[in-house]
């Protein structure tokens, strides 16, 4: 048995838990927009309801660690999973915009609490030699599982009302794997305050990339399904589009990482932003054909999921040894969450006038980020850190899991 196998086997139950959790999460996050659109809810209301999920996620990144520290990982996991399952099931019982906003808030808070628990366990059971490989496996599992969740949307119409129930069952299955896990509970350090203006002054390109990257990904999961329902009125189109785009995001991580190590983050951020702009313009003019939409979706996935990891890598490149890398990394994640929160609010309001405004906004942000990136100073090759693949969604503990943190201690 190889060393990496010896490292993975003890935490295989965590990977199974992550897989089922991500399938349920990905399915419900996309389906909420579809379901609300089928109920003929206004786009502005859909945007506000979806933004509530990310508001819960942001607050969870601040508050959940103290909860976990007090009651323990396994009890906290059961509690957060129970809250998440309850919120899913309540979605299917009754629609009220205020109730749904609160339920989405609870879902976001509990989901990110679950991620913090799982990632802290992974961090506890991995050493510095295998940390990068385990993080890569985590990334692959998260992308693929979230993609599988999109396929489950494309079930027989007779069972569409059961989507929330299916999502609940998947989350409950993850509890089984955690309950059978024999892993020492890591000690969680208390949440430390950070200043976004301070971080922006230190790593402006990284902060801007994190904000815009969060906007792209948040808009993708919450409002692109609404856009597709407006244009095609087909759950099947939404399902396949989301699947193909996520696969594009997964396949892009390693090539873009290698290219950024060779040519620098600044240039790759600009290229990804430019590509996002061009693909967004393609949607404006050639979105009448589903095959073309799927192709554009794959191309969009190649770029939007890489911007935040590139921003984090840029921060690691430019930071001095006396800077608090952990503080900066957590602030970038917080900034990413703010971008995800803003996206459904802005897009929901904009597409109330015309659905094409979604990709007009994407194109404008892509142009801005491209020029902003190229205006910044290039980092010498000798100062480049190693690019690390980061899942589209992660908790605050994944920052501790980043093997680049080891290099600064």
What would you call each of these model-derived segments?
Residues 113-126, 305-320:
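Intracellular juxtamembrane helix-capping segments at the cytosolic ends
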Residues 4-54, 203-206, 217-231, 238-241:
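Helix-loop boundary and gating motifs at the non-cytosolic
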Residues 1-6, 186-193, 317, 376-409:
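Intrinsic disorder in cytosolic terminal tails and internal cytosolic loops
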Residues 60-72, 157, 252-264, 351:
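Helix-to-loop junctions at the C-terminal end of transmembrane segments
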Residues 323-351:
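A late C-terminal transmembrane helix in Major Facilitator Superfamily
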Residues 75-89, 168, 267-282:
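Structural signature of the two symmetry-related core transmembrane helices
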Residues 98-106, 291-299:
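Paired small-residue
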Residues 153-154, 168-188, 369-378:
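C-terminal membrane-cytosol helix-exit motif in multi-pass small-molecule transporters
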